[in-house]
């Protein structure tokens, strides 16, 4: 509904890690585009560029890195086949912000829960540069993120803090003329997995591969991908995508 109502041509930027939440987010956007294309003659919404932006830290788990590369290639191919304005972009940290320069060259400790320097240097900064380029060119940009309140109490507080009652968009906390939209923020974990398992991937990828990556990353909790949401339940082993 929001995609149909937005009459501007400001680009949409989807943060895509290849994980379950960003996969569901892109799935819903893709299905919305298909519906608009089917139901509307020469829809102006299809003239708005939608960028699927994936950040490559260059130190990802090889299994996940290979999976993400294959997914991105399939997204680009299928978008061109369906003539949808979806474009894949990969960002990388600059040399001075890279993992090995910081750990070996500057003596930084390996990122941990208390000091996750990699998030800013290797993920936020590269993506922010791309967003700034789009804002400079188009005046404004909208970032779509796959964050959910049910992820954690901390995440729920963060979402609530930045929400504006009655508004879909919130101002980006740092970047000017940039707005944030979180379409799946109210989804529970089981709803995310239901979408992944019940709806075929619009770009033609096998979603069972993603399911198995999470399952295999949780050897002592192999049913995690289908767990009924419970606040006392921990995250899925080492299945986090990205830094």
For each feature predicted by the language model, list its residue ranges:
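Nucleotide-activated chemistry modules centered on ATP-dependent adenylation/adenylyltransferase
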Residues: 1-13, 22-243
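Catalytic cores of secreted/periplasmic lytic hydrolases that degrade extracellular macromolecules
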Residues: 19
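The Walker A (P-loop) glycine that initiates the GxxxxGKT/S ATP-binding motif of P-loop NTPases
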Residues: 16
């Amino acid at each position: 509904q929001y995609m149909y109502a937005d009459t501007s041509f400001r680009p949409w930027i989807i943060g895509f890690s290849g994980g379950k939440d960003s996969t569901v987010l892109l799935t819903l956007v893709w299905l919305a585009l298909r519906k608009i294309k089917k139901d509307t003659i020469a829809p102006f919404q299809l003239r708005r560029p939608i960028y699927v932006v994936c950040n490559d830290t260059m130190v990802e788990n090889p299994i996940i890195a290979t999976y993400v590369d294959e997914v991105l290639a399939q997204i680009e191919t299928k978008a061109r086949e369906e003539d949808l304005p979806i474009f894949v972009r990969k960002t990388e940290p600059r040399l001075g912000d890279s993992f090995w320069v910081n750990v070996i060259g500057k003596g930084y400790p390996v990122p941990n829960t208390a000091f996750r320097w990699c998030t800013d240097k290797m993920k936020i900064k590269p993506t922010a540069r791309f967003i700034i380029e789009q804002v400079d060119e188009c005046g404004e940009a909208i970032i779509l993120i796959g964050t959910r309140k049910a992820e954690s109490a901390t995440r729920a507080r963060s979402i609530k803090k930045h929400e504006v009652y009655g508004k879909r968009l919130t101002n980006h906390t740092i970047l000017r003329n940039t707005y944030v939209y979180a379409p799946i923020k109210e989804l529970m974990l089981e709803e995310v997995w239901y979408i992944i398992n019940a709806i075929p991937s619009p770009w033609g990828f096998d979603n069972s591969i993603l399911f198995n990556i999470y399952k295999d990353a949780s050897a002592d909790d192999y049913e995690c991908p289908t767990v009924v949401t419970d606040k006392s339940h921990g995250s899925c082993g080492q299945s986090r995508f990205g830094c």
